[in-house]
Amino acid sequence: IDVLSRNSTWTLSRDTSLGLNYTGISYYDGQGFMIRKSLKVNSALELNSASICVQTGTTNEQNTSDYFKGNNMKYEVIAFGTADETVKAYESGRCDVFTSDVSQLYAERLKVANPAEHVVLPEVISKEPLGPMVRHGDDQWFDVVKWTLFAMVGAEELGITQKNVDEMAKSDKPELKRAFGTDGNLGEQLGLTKDWVSRIVKAVGNYGESFDRNVGAGSKLGIARGL
């Protein structure tokens, strides 16, 4: 594959030991907790003595330990090797709580038999920076992927959208002229065409449009934008 984009937190060990480079942060996730509404729990601070399903080999294990110890609460960990095993155990009632990154909790909630019977609690107990990864050793491709992400973020800041991209390309504003390649040729430094930013926005939209379509208000997940 050319690009790996998934919920693998950017950590020092992953960045230095896997032969991969993180190209930037495209999404700030964070660990949360999902629980059945029938248990009438409104806050993670009410989870003292709860049993918690967690996937091994993730940052979730250590984060859970730190959070409960820091709040002087007891808990029981029930660990599983894969995400599917963890979710199935939670759904079958083997534990009170399922903990993972909030984005995964929303996604897994859609798969359970009765999604409306489960709630993601408001507390986010960690910061999990996520972003596209590429292989070591191909610096040009690393630059292309990195600056594609930056271009999507910059397009949103400048008000460039899929609908208005052609009109915005006619602007006399210096920053827009540079972005669209009508003043200079930044794309050439990446091995791309002058209109590389326009092509990106036309294909997938700016960062906000992509967020809304895939995980935000325009998706089944309905995750709030946050940062």
Give short role names for the model-derived ranges.
Residues 1-46, 102-126:
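Acidic, polar ligand-binding/catalytic clefts
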Residues 1-7, 50-53, 91-100:
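Alpha-to-beta junction loops
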Residues 9-10, 28-85, 139:
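Bilobed "Venus flytrap"/periplasmic-binding protein-like clamshell domains
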Residues 12, 93-95, 156, 200:
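Extracytoplasmic low-complexity repetitive segments enriched in small/polar residues
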Residues 35-41, 45, 49-59, 104-105, ...:
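Extended ligand-binding regions for polar small-molecule ligands
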Residues 81-117, 132:
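Extracellular/periplasmic bilobed ligand-binding domains
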Residues 213-227:
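Conserved C-terminal helix/tail region of periplasmic/extracytoplasmic solute-binding proteins
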